[in-house]
Amino acid sequence: MKALSKLKAEKGIWLVDAPKPEMGHNDLLIKIKKTAICGTDMHIYNWDEWSQKTIPVPMVVGHEYVGEVVDIGQEVRGFKIGDRVSGEGHITCGHCRNCRAGRTHLCRNTSGVGVNREGSFAEYLVIPAFNAFKIPDDISDDLASIFDPFGNAVHTALSFDLVGEDVLITGAGPIGIMAAAVCRHVGARHVVITDVNEYRLELARKMGATRAVNVSKENLKDVMKELGMTEGFDVGLEMSGVPSAFHAMLDTMNHGGKVAMLGIPGGEMAIDWSKVIFKGLVIKGIYGREMFETWYKMASLIQSGLDISPIITHHYKIDDFQKGFDAMGSGQSGKVILSWD
């Protein structure tokens, strides 16, 4: 089968002929229709320090996808041939304390599809049936292929009550932009998103952000005054991993504010903890998606009218995969879809 593999321990990714994966008794075999390129895939492509420590070479990568079930393990129930599915990319152990308590998104033994095991940039993928999620008929393949990052946005945004609240999102990558759309859809008052990438800030405006602020040109506190805000942001969603962005968030949070952190800093990050203490802030770390409450909420949000389609900006056939990675690497894109049909 065709597959995109991290074939060498250097920058790049390669289109190869790989063996079709073998299925176990509790697995599904999925014929891939579309995949999306994640920021994680770009780290792997660029072969940065994290990738060098984490990714086995050679390995098929990728973890954002939609496809069709073409074979079912003999122990599997609840799926049939022809089901259209995406899937949770975090494979959990099932036996640690959190797994046994139903908090599988906090499994201490998580294995990542396309990170620690063979991924979805291929014509076929095998995953445990537990990890598959049936896609409703009224949700397109394009949208289903980005459910993984959309789930990060939904999990982060819905960590706290948003109705009537003022929300600050730091980092206008695709996940931050989708989070802005979610916040507006569920009833936040002002949703302000910050970045220095004007292309992505414009995408955020299209997706419903009240204000998309280029912090290299505008002062965040001036924007707050313009919006009539007198007490600070009620909810903060940190999506950038950039220390200066998090510092600005702590400066502008209201007393008693709540912060959800998804962005991963490049290293240790020092902050002024007195701001957290004296403001009485609550900080919550976010990793992945809740299984499977986040997935049901994703489908329901789209079915209730949330439109995240503007975040998909580029489409390529798999043979043109290099153009897709170039588009992602340029910073002048939203989500990039690769078609395997």
Curated annotation (Swiss-Prot):
Principal subcellular localisation of the protein: cytoplasm
Cellular localisation: Cytoplasm
GO MF, any single term: L-threonine 3-dehydrogenase activity
Protein keywords: Cytoplasm, Metal-binding, NAD, Oxidoreductase, Zinc
GO biological-process terms attached to the record: L-threonine catabolic process to glycine
Cofactor note: Binds 2 Zn(2+) ions per subunit.
Chain residues that bind Zn(2+) 2: 93, 96, 99, 107
Keyword Glycoprotein: no
Annotated site residue numbers, Important for catalytic activity for the proton relay mechanism but does not participate directly in the coordination of zinc atom: 148
E.C. numbers: 1.1.1.103
Obligatory cofactor(s): Zn(2+)
Tree of life domain: Bacteria
Binding site for NAD(+): 175, 195, 200, 262-264, 286-287
NCBIfam families from the UniProt entry: PRK05396.1, tdh
Subunit-structure text: Homotetramer.
Described purpose of this protein according to its UniProt entry: Catalyzes the NAD(+)-dependent oxidation of L-threonine to 2-amino-3-ketobutyrate.
Family label: Belongs to the zinc-containing alcohol dehydrogenase family.
The protein's name: L-threonine 3-dehydrogenase
